[in-house]
Each structure stands twice: as structure tokens, then as C-alpha cells.
A protein has these predicted regions:
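A short, Lys/Arg-rich alpha-helix, primarily the initiator
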Residues: 1-15, 49, 64-65, 72
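The alpha-helix within a helix-turn-helix
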Residues: 12, 23, 52
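Short alpha-helical DNA-recognition segment
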Residues: 16-35
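DNA major-groove recognition helix of helix-turn-helix/homeodomain DNA-binding modules
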Residues: 46-62
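Short, charged recognition helix plus adjacent turn
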Residues: 64-83
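Alpha-helical and coiled-coil interaction segments, frequently adjacent to or embedded
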Residues: 77-307, 312-329, 461-488
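NUDIX/MutT-family hydrolases
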Residues: 417-420, 431-481
Length: 488
């Protein structure tokens, strides 16, 4: 085994690098530089040009640094980058030198790695929990990165070409198309700067894995999701979907959010420059489904239409301990991913319906029923099974009406979502939701005056505004603007 490379370590320090900093600069694991300096490892030839560049030396000078043992002997005529003569050139034995690429990370376990893992996770959690002075502050700051033409009314969220409708349309008029064609999207990378270290001292393979291990929300499951492929307003709103998985989309959204939060913290609370957002920059147009993997969930504002004109609406506060994203914010309800109830091919097609997805969310969030996740032995019979049968009947009678506003995008995560409104006659609402639960798996209902709902008034929306997510605030403002149409 070679001796300690004190000359190499001295050059690193002279250039202002910690061992971890040099490791990041040359693209190796954090413990590798320490092993180079102790003489345990020797960098492979193909890696040396990058090391030389980081240390601002020539390859020949780097070889001198790497071959200098800890017992120096004077040399003459050798000046390294203007520094005094260094040590004699006594190379370590090639037979005893081990390259970093030949050593498994498990060989390097010890206090050094444990401490670095601890710091990595601590910093990752600190950045992830950054929320700004107000819950949606970071989302609105992120919106400033994009031109005004890309922002929805109010400027809280983004919207793409043909995404948001000027006037809501009835849900039945929205046409859905399903495509079996595979349409690959370039992978978002590199993502090492937004991922913490595993217990082995290696980067997590994905953001969802890190959330599972370090945040541990009660609800985090990788299920099949419908993937947005095309949006068109030719002859009405038409949405084309394929399939993806929840984690594939979640990983992209959370990596983008984490990168923005880290840059925001580093800038002292200012809007980050694009140069500090390499992942976001590589995406380019975030509204292009060919460049950005999207699975737009469905969020529905539920309004109880009162015969006396005292209309009310439902709000939900998400529990940060239960959900992987959006914890602590108030949102319209019900809200959920656009997903089939199971992986079975029959369900992928049977559940490919906005209305059926919305019904399942009402069943879960309003009535507290278990999540319809394919755990049953057969497909859902929406015509006969309750509460779906009653939902269908109320809608057929014209007393449970639904409207679609199109799509918006959260500026922080670049996550797309569909915005819908449901208007139920008071008598129908009270009958369908007589078993309304105040608390469900994802959070609790927000009400006032001892009730489980809020008055549908401009004043109530204004009072709720600081607690609302950006996309829910946008939908509420649109619905209030269009209240005569929706409640007529």
C-alpha cells in the first residue's frame, strides 16, 4: 500500500476544496478523495484529466502529487504551479494500489461515511421542508420564472396552450382518447444534487425511495397512472392519455421542487436564476408532453347549491404526516390521481373516465371508504355498487352537475392537474353524504361555525386565501367569477 499523499492533500486545500468538495467536482463518491490521500486508492488514468483540471495542475504535475509519499525528500528544479519544491518522486507500488472503481462502498463503512450520510440526509430534509413565509410562496415565486402569457388568471399557477378554458364546459363534453403507443421521454438528469445518501453512502436511486425511507408518509404507493399525451381544443376539449406510474411522475416533480428550494435558500429568499436550476432548464417547454412526463390528477371544487341562495363549498386540509406532497395546505375536495382502480387490463379501460375517477374520490374522501386500489376480487360495477349507483342516479336526474375548466400546472413542481367543479342540489348533497367524515386518510375537512363546509362567498374565499394551495385558489376564483353559470 502506498504512503499518505500529503502533497496531493496540500494542493487540494490550497485550491479551497474539502475532500467532499473535490469529490463532487470530479464526480466520485465523497469517501474516495480521502482514500486517494491515504494512499489506499489510486485514480484510474481516465479520471486524472478531470482531477488535474479541478486542482489547476498539468497531468504531469498531478502524477507528481499522486506519487509523492508522506516522507518527503528534497528535489531540485521542481516547482509546482509557483509553489516551493515539493517531495521526491517515490511512486507507490502498483501491485498494492487499489482503484476507487474496484472497491465496493461497503468496504469503506465507518465513522467517516456515517457522518457524511447523516449530514447529507439532514441537509436534504432541511431543503425539502422549506416552505417560505406562506404555504404557497415558493409556488408563486417559481411562476415568476415564466412569462405572464404562461400564467393563469391571478398568476398563481401556469397554463399551457389550449389548457385552460375561458368558460367551463360540462364534464360530458370533454373527450378522452386512449393510446397504446409507447412515447418515451428523456430522463431527467443528472439528479445527484437533489438526492440524499443511503445508509451505504451511495446516492438514492430515486426521490420516491428517499421519501419512503426518510419522510415515511403513511400514504405512498406506486400505482399505474394515466399519462397525458396530447391536449386539443379543436371542436371542444380533447385529452389523449397513455399510461405511466405514480413514482415516475412523482420523482420528476419532487426533484424539480427540491432543486428550486435549494436555490431559493442559497439566494437568501430571492427568485433563483435559471443558471441555478439545471434540471428545470433541460426540460425547456414544460407544457409539451413529449418533453415532460405528466399525469394530471383531478381536483374538484364541490358546491352545495342551497335553495335559499346560501351556497357552500367543501375544503380539505392535507395532513403532512400522511401524504407525500402538499401537506399542510388547504385544497378543494375531492382530489386525487387520475388512475385505474387496478393493474388489470379490464380496469385500465373500464376506469378510463373522469367521472368514474371523481366518484371513487368522493367515496374515499367524503364517505371514508377504503381506497379503491384493486384489492377487491372483481372490477367495480359502477351501475350497481354503492355509492356509485346513487351518484350515477343523481347525475342522470340533473341534480349532480359537473364542469371542467381544463388544466393548470403547479410552477414549483411542474405538476399538471385538471380543474373541475361539482354542483349538487342541497337535498341531494345531504342524502348522498349523510355519512360525511370530518377526517379521512389524507387530512380533515375545513369548516366554520361548527359546520363541515364554508360559505361560497367572496369574503370567505378572501379569508381562506393564505391557507389555500395555488391551484385551489385559482379554481375558487374562477368558480366565483363564473358562479351564475355554475349555479344557474
Amino acid at each position: 500500500m502506498g504512503g499518505k499523499r500529503e502533497a496531493f492533500a496540500a494542493r487540494r486545500e490550497a485550491m479551497g476544496f474539502t475532500q467532499e468538495g473535490l469529490a463532487a467536482a470530479v464526480g466520485v463518491e465523497f469517501y474516495t478523495v480521502g482514500r486517494w490521500e491515504r494512499g489506499v486508492l489510486t485514480p484510474q488514468p481516465w479520471r486524472r484529466p478531470r482531477i488535474a483540471k479541478a486542482l489547476d495542475v498539468s497531468l504531469e504535475e498531478l502524477n507528481v502529487l499522486l506519487d509523492s509519499p508522506d516522507l518527503p525528500q528534497p528535489v531540485t528544479g521542481q516547482v509546482l504551479m509557483g509553489r516551493p519544491p515539493q517531495t521526491s518522486l517515490v511512486p507507490s507500488s502498483p501491485a498494492s494500489a487499489v482503484t476507487a472503481d474496484q472497491v465496493d462502498a461497503s468496504d469503506a463503512f465507518g465513522p467517516e461515511i456515517a457522518e457524511h450520510v447523516r449530514r447529507s440526509r439532514e441537509e436534504w430534509l432541511r431543503v425539502r421542508r422549506a416552505a417560505g413565509a406562506r404555504g404557497r410562496e415558493l409556488t408563486e415565486l417559481a411562476a415568476w420564472l415564466y412569462p405572464v402569457s404562461k400564467r393563469a388568471p391571478g398568476g398563481h399557477v401556469l397554463t399551457g396552450p389550449d389548457w385552460l378554458l375561458d368558460t367551463p364546459v360540462e364534464l360530458n363534453s370533454v373527450r378522452l382518447k386512449f393510446s397504446e403507443v409507447e412515447r418515451p421521454v428523456s430522463k431527467l438528469k443528472p439528479v445527484d444534487h437533489v438526492l440524499p445518501l443511503t445508509a451505504r453512502g451511495e446516492r438514492y436511486a430515486g426521490y420516491s425511495r428517499a421519501v419512503r425511507d426518510l419522510v415515511r408518509p403513511r400514504l405512498l404507493e406506486n400505482r399505474l397512472s394515466y399519462r397525458l399525451l396530447e391536449v386539443s381544443q379543436c371542436n371542444g376539449l380533447e385529452l389523449t392519455f397513455g399510461t405511466t406510474t405514480f413514482f415516475e411522475v412523482f420523482d420528476i416533480k419532487e426533484c424539480l421542487a427540491h432543486e428550486f428550494k435549494a436555490a431559493w435558500l442559497a439566494s437568501g429568499g430571492s427568485v433563483p436564476d435559471w443558471s441555478a436550476l439545471p434540471l428545470r432548464s433541460t426540460i425547456g417547454d414544460p407544457f409539451d408532453p413529449a418533453r415532460m412526463l405528466m399525469s394530471p390528477g383531478i381536483s374538484t371544487l364541490t358546491i352545495r347549491k342551497d335553495r335559499r341562495g346560501e351556497h357552500r363549498f367543501m375544503m380539505h386540509q392535507r395532513d403532512g404526516r400522511a401524504v407525500a406532497d402538499g401537506g399542510g395546505m388547504c385544497t378543494v375536495m375531492p382530489s386525487g390521481e387520475f388512475q385505474p382502480s387496478s393493474l388489470a387490463a379490464v380496469d385500465v379501460h373500464n376506469d378510463f373516465s373522469l367521472w368514474r375517477n371523481i366518484m371513487r374520490e368522493y367515496s374515499e374522501e367524503f364517505l371514508g371508504n377504503p381506497e379503491h386500489d384493486g384489492a377487491g376480487t372483481s372490477s367495480i360495477d359502477y351501475a350497481e355498487q354503492e355509492p356509485f349507483r346513487s351518484f350515477e342516479q343523481a347525475r342522470a336526474d340533473g341534480r349532480f352537475r359537473l364542469w371542467h375548466y381544463g388544466l393548470v400546472m403547479d410552477a414549483l413542481t411542474l405538476g399538471a392537474s385538471q380543474r373541475t367543479v361539482a354542483v349538487l342540489d342541497d337535498e341531494i348533497f345531504d342524502r348522498l353524504f349523510t355519512g360525511l367524515v370530518a377526517t379521512n386518510d389524507e387530512g380533515h375537512v375545513v369548516g366554520e361555525g361548527g359546520r363541515t363546509d364554508m360559505p361560497f362567498t367572496s369574503e370567505a374565499i378572501d379569508r381562506l386565501e393564505p391557507r389555500l394551495s395555488a391551484s385551489s385558489l385559482t379554481l375558487l376564483r374562477l368558480a366565483w367569477r363564473d358562479r351564475q353559470l355554475l349555479l344557474g
